Regions:
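Active-site neighborhood of glycoside hydrolase catalytic domains
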Residues: 293, 297-311, 373-460
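Extracellular ectodomain segments of secreted/surface proteins
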Residues: 43-70
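Short, aromatic- and glycine-rich surface loops/edge beta-strands on solvent-exposed regions
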Residues: 71, 96-105
Length: 612
């Protein structure tokens, strides 16, 4: 075998794709030096050992290394039931979903048995909800970063108009934020961000007492709360100072409540202790502060989810799961054996990012996941689904393949790394069923043939966004939108519909030198707007487009708060650092409540009167 042939064989054996198809359908070849570099980074995971986990769907039969003799299935409670192979020597798995062990004499093999589909509320057909960038919300005393308290008025509006879901931006624990902060580059996805949890909601007496004792702190909190944009480093420092002061007040003046905090920490056990030790090392400070901060965050979001469900929301809060984590964060450090050490996640060049994207994050190694029985993936799902009614998985295609590149390399010099899609899907569906948690998979961009159909068959909803929901003939009419999807007018990476209609994103990109011929781009956008106006047949394209969205057969429609408020500037401009205020804009201090109520009623009425 020649050197090139051996390299290609080794690459394919490791799950790398030496050839891939770009957005235009062109076949692209990965350079040999890229394959060698990525293979070298994968070598430690390839040599690791562990206990594998088989997965299956209820009613399937699996091939296990046993004999035709007596065997049994053992459930999580230790109860046994007989197991018998079929005529082909395969073993039919139990009909009850769960984590089982097949046992034959001393031989035990773990098998996860998943239901056919992810969970969905039985009586919910065409629901709707709101989507919030939590850090952008406003509430008194938020100290410059929107938090859980800012959700309350929006949950009240949701209840008033019969909505069923409230989708959150990522709430993962972060690194000490700098000016380039992104919620999609977390320190640890298994734990929560205390900067976006309200002390005034969790411990109001202690929080106010801390401000009374420290008047300079109180003054700084008031000033930061009124700011138009987020100063992440300054606001984070302010919130941590307040949190430490509130913890001391709680310990001294409210021993009963402090006892509840300590009881929760004891129940969380070694996992919390390990995280807090790493967080204190990464961020500096006292591990006790981080433990208290996690209680505050857990308390706030659990309370809000319960409140939403008790007020009639069939789904409640929807979490957002980032595709990876910071390579120097707590998650990567605590699970180093499961991570893609020396590799960075990103995206290949496409029509929107001609140089590709390097995201500055790492993720799980598929080789390590298999050898560790998928334990890191399962624990992550359980952490994110806890006290939530849904989870949106950013870049769901990462369950199938991810673009990886050596750290520091150009995003063009990457390669697709394949993941065990069926095993990961089975585990995702099983945990969804166990947690009663809806699953949404963000499937925008270049999607391999058949993947959307596979996800839909397992009850994982895709995402359809108005500017992209079209074919060669133009924008799709409402009845042609996917049923197994979430319908949205925009996302955090796009301008709100009002900004898209006016070309705000194009002007920003031209200002940053990313568009050379702005007049031509604006002319194309005007043509798109005209086509959309012709489709909706209304006097106000923005409102009528929301009406079209509401009338789709999609199982769920989500209205970002920026669209609900009629804003025009987008949250994040992908591919930019510094030139655009990514993740820093806050919602206005005041809004036109009558216009907002009218828009919410418009969407709600469209869902009630649309397709069954």
């Amino acid at each position: 075998m020649s050197g090139d042939a051996a390299l290609l064989a080794a690459a394919r054996s490791a799950g790398l794709m030496p050839q891939w198809e770009d957005v235009s359908g062109r076949q692209c070849q990965v350079a040999p030096e890229v394959l060698r570099a990525v293979l070298q980074a994968l070598q430690p995971q390839a040599e690791a050992s562990g206990t594998p986990l088989h997965t299956a769907i209820c009613g399937e039969a699996v091939v296990l290394p046993g004999t035709a003799g007596a065997a049994c299935w053992v459930d999580e409670a230790g109860q046994q039931r007989d197991a018998h192979p079929d005529s082909a020597g395969r073993w039919p798995v139990p009909l009850q979903p769960g984590y089982w062990h097949w046992q034959q004499g001393p031989r035990r093999i773990a098998v996860a048995v998943a239901p056919h589909k992810a969970w969905w509320p039985a009586h919910l057909d065409r629901g709707w909800g709101l989507a919030a960038q939590v850090y952008s919300l406003r509430s008194a005393g938020d100290a410059g970063i929107g938090d859980s308290a800012g959700c309350t008025p929006w949950l009240q509006r949701l209840q008033q108009h019969g909505g069923q879901a409230f989708a959150l931006s990522p709430m993962h624990a972060g690194l000490p934020p700098d000016a380039g902060y992104s919620p999609y580059s977390p320190s640890d996805r298994r734990w929560l961000d205390p900067l976006q949890a309200s002390l005034l909601q969790a411990v109001p007496v202690a929080a106010r007492a801390a401000l009374a004792v420290h008047p300079a702190l109180a003054e700084a909190v008031d000033a930061a709360s009124a700011a138009r944009r987020i100063d992440w480093p300054a606001a984070a420092d302010l919130k941590w100072r307040w949190l430490r002061a509130a913890r001391l007040q709680l310990q001294q003046a409210q021993p009963e409540l402090w006892g509840e905090v300590c009881q929760w920490q004891n129940h969380a056990g070694a996992a919390l202790q390990d995280y807090c030790a790493l967080a204190a090392d990464v961020r500096s400070g006292d591990a006790q502060d981080h433990a208290f901060a996690q209680w505050v965050a857990q308390h706030c979001w659990t309370q809000l989810h319960s409140q939403a469900c008790n007020n009639g929301a069939a789904i409640g809060l929807i979490a957002d799961l980032a595709v990876g984590c910071a390579p120097d964060g707590a998650e990567a450090r605590s699970q180093a054996s499961a991570m893609l050490a020396g590799l960075e996640l990103g995206a290949p060049p496409d029509a929107f990012n001609t140089q590709g994207q390097a995201w500055g994050i790492t993720g799980f190694s598929p080789l390590a996941l298999r050898r560790q029985g998928y334990a890191p993936f399962i624990s992550l799902l359980r952490a994110v689904m806890a006290s939530r009614g849904g989870v949106r998985i950013d870049h769901i295609l990462g369950l199938h393949r991810l673009w990886v590149l050596p750290q520091g390399a150009s995003a063009r010099d990457g390669v697709y790394l394949q993941f065990p899609l069926q095993d990961l899907l089975n585990l995702l569906v099983l945990e969804s069923w166990r947690h009663r948690c809806v699953v949404i998979g963000e499937d925008l961009g270049v999607v391999p043939a058949g993947i959307r159909q596979q996800l839909a068959a397992r009850g994982v909803l895709g995402v359809d966004v108005l500017p992209f929901t079209r074919d060669e003939a133009g924008f799709l009419p409402a009845e042609r939108w996917r049923r197994d999807a979430v319908a949205m007018p925009s996302t955090h990476d796009l301008p709100p519909l009002g900004g898209w209609l006016r070309g705000r994103d194009l002007r920003w990109r031209a200002r940053l030198g990313e568009i050379e011929d702005l007049p031509s781009s604006l002319a194309q956008r005007r043509s798109d707007v005209t086509a959309l106006a012709d489709l909706v047949h209304g006097d106000c394209v923005e409102d009528d487009a929301l009406g079209l969205l509401a009338s789709t057969p999609s199982r769920l429609a989500l209205l970002p708060l920026e669209d609900a408020l009629g804003l025009r500037t987008q949250v994040n401009l992908p591919g930019t650092v510094g030139g655009h205020p990514n993740w820093r804009r806050r919602l206005p201090l005041h809004c036109n409540e009558a216009a907002l109520q009218s828009r919410l009623q418009h969407v709600s009425a469209g869902r009630d009167g649309g397709h069954a």
